[in-house]
Regions:
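Conserved ABC ATPase signature
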Residues: 152-156, 160
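Helix N-cap at the start of a conserved alpha-helix in ABC-type nucleotide-binding domains
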Residues: 188-190
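A short, proline-enriched helix->beta-strand linker immediately N-terminal to the Walker B motif
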Residues: 171-175
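Short coil-to-helix segment of the ABC ATPase nucleotide-binding domain corresponding to the Q-loop/switch region
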Residues: 111-119
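Catalytic Walker B motif of ABC-type/P-loop ATPase nucleotide-binding domains
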Residues: 177-180
Length: 259
């Protein structure tokens, strides 16, 4: 990994390749994410954005390349082209450094809001209930939903459910947050409250990778923007530069279509 001062990147993805049903979904994607980076990943549907995100925490399995999370190797490819993952327990531990928020919220419907937050810290991390509850309540307060602590997800709006999902991911105290189109399933009037929550995390210097269709959010909140098309990173630059003067014709065409 490139040494920037005393730190190394939180995530290094090198030449990630993935095939699916005979087609190449990812064609050699490389990206480094440093502490405090907020990276927006944009691009047309089917460009591999979500697949790449899901490869980072092993929800998808890569066919070739290297994934290093906080200096620990999750997957690597040998000289013969064989891709190997860290042993399962180790892979799980490495992936716990990353919190994930999905398009579809994925809250446990049979648990209250508070129970949704304390479940994983108790079962996965083995933390005591008494220690977890104050932290969970603080996170609910942070996303503006402490009053809903005893409600069930079905009683919440989509925007509220997604904010709970963000709080639930944060309850595991990750170093990196991955967002997979967090507002795509929401009614337009509810996207703002979710984006405000993500913006607040950016202000607190949480390291984030956000796959999004929200161009204003990508331009205003992210430190850099990655444009993907057809399984490749076409352009990765500081947000202001990419939006004001895209270097690649495909980026330009996409932005003209979106803005």
């Amino acid at each position: 990994p490139s040494m920037k001062g005393e730190t190394f990147p939180l995530i290094v993805a090198r030449d990630i390749r993935m095939h699916f049903g005979g087609s190449d979904v990812l064609k050699g994607v490389s990206l480094e994410i440093d502490k405090g980076d907020v990276i927006a990943v944009i691009g047309p549907s089917g460009s591999g954005k979500s697949t790449f995100l899901r490869c980072l925490n092993h929800l998808e399995t890569i066919d070739a390349g290297e994934l290093v999370i906080e200096g620990e190797t999750l997957a690597s490819t040998d000289a013969e082209g064989v891709c190997r993952y860290a042993p399962e327990a180790e892979a799980r531990r490495i992936c716990r450094k990353m919190g994930m928020v999905f398009q579809q919220f994925n809250l446990f419907p049979h648990l209250t809001v508070l129970q949704n937050l304390i479940e994983a810290p108790m079962t996965v991390k083995g933390m005591a209930r008494d220690a977890v509850i104050p932290k969970a309540e603080a996170l609910l307060d942070k996303v503006g939903l402490l009053a809903k602590r005893d409600a069930y997800p079905s009683r919440l709006s989509g925007g509220q459910q997604q904010r709970v999902a963000i709080a639930r991911a944060l309850a595991m105290e990750p170093d990196i947050m991955l967002f997979d189109e967090p507002t795509s399933a929401l009614d337009p009037e509810l996207t703002g409250e979710v984006l405000r929550t993500i913006r607040q995390l950016a202000d607190e210097h949480m390291t984030m990778l956000v796959v999004t269709h929200e161009m204003n959010f990508a331009r205003d909140v992210s430190t850099s923007v990655v444009f993907m098309d057809n399984g490749e990173i076409i352009e990765a630059r500081p947000a202001g530069e990419l939006f004001s003067s895209p270097a690649h014709p495909r980026t330009r065409a996409f932005l003209e279509h979106m803005l």
